[in-house]
Amino acid sequence: MHWADATSEKIMKKRNAEEYVVSSGITPSGHIHIGNARETLTADAVYKGMLKKGAEAKLIFIADDYDPLRKLYPFLPKEFEKYIGMPLSEIPCPQGCCKSYADHFLMPFLNSLEDLGVEITTHRANECYKAGMYNEAIITALENRLKIKELLDSYRKEPLADNWYPLNVVCEKCGKMHETKVTSYNSEDKTITYVCKCGFENTVQPFNGIGKLPWRVDWPARWNIFGVTAEPMGKDHAASGGSYDTGIKIARQIFNYQAPEKMVYEWIQLKIGDKAMPMSSSSGVVFAVKDWTEICHPEVLRFLILKGKPTKHIDFDLKAISNLVDDYDELERKYFELIEKQKTEELNDNENEKISLYELVTPKIPERLPLQVAYRFCSIIAQIALDKETQKIDMERVFDILGRNGYNPAEFSEYDKSRLEKRLYMSKKWASDYGENLEINDFEQAKEQYETLSEEQKAWLKAFSKEVENIEIDANTIHELMYETATKLNLAPKEAFVASYKILLGKNYGPKLGSFLASLKKEFVIGRFNLTE
């Protein structure tokens, strides 16, 4: 059983609710990266597991856009220093293209969720507070402030001040909330008095967006408001004495609500060279979800995140994304093989888990096994078939190349062609930005490389080019011919490969050579390998 199915089953047995609400959330203080997406996709996986079991369930996303800007992040202009302490929803867009700072970072993520196959109801904290959804919770918190203080102090080394109030007020003059302080609360007329460092002071009812609960009180309050029964959380929140531990007690003792079941997830680390660093919007170590959808299929991101348990950390290497796509393609082939097998045989647990995983990570399952052209090979084809002037890929050239590599384009469905074209453009961008950008040597560069070769390698190049004149060029024939001609001349095949890569790419290595040469025009291959003429 896949972990998402097991988790949803466990939650349903424990809660036995009429409706299950699975929640996810993020503070849009910077670029929302694939590490953040792990939370939302984990929630989505468990939600889908509940639906599969026939439960009434819904998936919600809470955007904490009423949190303040905490500091001047490295990606912000200096003039944004004046907005520190203001709610993210009230700060202008840093690039002037969106309604607010929060929207600038939030909207690309929300738009990408549809591509990722996530159907979710979004609640923006600023709208919820302004609409009065938190008013009752604010009153409850203020009237129980000493009890909340006692609960929080039991986890703190230094106790909160005796005059602490569980409320952050948005100053009505300067708009900041990090420099205000509540000095008193009147339970009769439900007003608070606050002062701000800007010099402003007022007595006001802290409702409809005037006041916001601090995180450790806001979180359990929202569980009650939205009826949350399950929620993924990072290991920092789930740590002993963390906000989940205090949230359990505040939810039960202050808001009379049972805390949701927790699903703890590990970080996704971005691998750069030999180092792997946790992604962080504030530090700038990010790979945004919108960036992913430009270089790879959304279902492959779901595969990366959902194939293993949430508690397993992931090292994500952009340079190795082709290997990840290969793994997804292998799962896809296995899925269709098992769908046929189960018509006549009973599948074992491992096989059933593969079916569950593919169905979970693939939002739109094709009717049959679609065309699969390896991602890395697509990156090569895309660069060869690219029209440099229009920057469009010549699909007829692509079909010609594939025909010489064992494919039959006449059998491609419209779905096959569409998916292939998407993979070509995505893999081309990946190769350009993160992978191997294929730059074939011009004639003069090839001549320079030719002069660095041994006499045996030069002789092989000439012999090979002569043989190519007499064959129909395709990947397998080319591969076999390289070995045959090298063997005849007593040249180690490895030396023949090195010679080929040098005159073509100026390197000692490169893509799979048979497929690469079959992707090029026959006349070009003959001319490039016979540089003596």
From Swiss-Prot:
Belongs to the class-I aminoacyl-tRNA synthetase family. It catalyses: tRNA(Lys) + L-lysine + ATP = L-lysyl-tRNA(Lys) + AMP + diphosphate. This is Lysine--tRNA ligase. Its EC number is 6.1.1.6. It comes from the Archaea. Keywords: Aminoacyl-tRNA synthetase, ATP-binding, Cytoplasm, Ligase, Nucleotide-binding, Protein biosynthesis. One of its GO terms (molecular function) is lysine-tRNA ligase activity. Transmembrane segments: none annotated. A motif ('HIGH' region) lies at residues 28-36. It comes from Methanococcus maripaludis (Methanococcus deltae). The keyword Plastid does not apply. A motif ('KMSKS' region) lies at residues 278-282. GO terms for biological process: lysyl-tRNA aminoacylation. It is found in: Cytoplasm. Coiled coil: none annotated. Its main location: cytoplasm. NCBIfam families: lysS_arch. One of its GO terms (cellular component) is cytoplasm.
